[in-house]
């Protein structure tokens, strides 16, 4: 009995040494990870509101067939308001976001993360963007790879071209964990980078965001779906906090 007790105490002391983690501790960390939750119930705008506003921007977004849909040309034209992005009512820090999206012809949109609301300024002035784009249409108009689907817009080009044909559903996985970010498109990791790294700072200085000091500096923020005056469909929006 005494030998078993000594063996137990020795094993316990090893697990408590600096740099060591116990099996129980690992199990607790795994069990404490939050389960994925739906950010969109498919029926109501619960959990969402307009950027820099309090209510759901029904003139710019609609809900049909279990989908969130940006309304084409809403707010476009001389003398009319800018299109309104849709943002979560809660802020998030570290998470995995997954969703499905479908582009229409000439569609342009994005998923912005760690969004901060800037008075009288758009969401993209402060937040990185997972670009969603009808690539063939805009490639013909001269846009660059760093502006195509899957890219961290104007910062990191997508490494692979895996966007499906216009009108097909695509799947996004976005990992934001501390300063580490991953963009996944249709099961392929197309972008990986570190916010605030030396490489990131060099790209930032050469980007269109260089004159926006808030860009990419937030440790937490809202998640936004961009309305860029084109019709884009979103569904199955799930988030797991890390």
Q: Residues of each region from the PLM?
A:
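Bacterial Sec-dependent N-terminal signal peptides
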Residues: 1-30
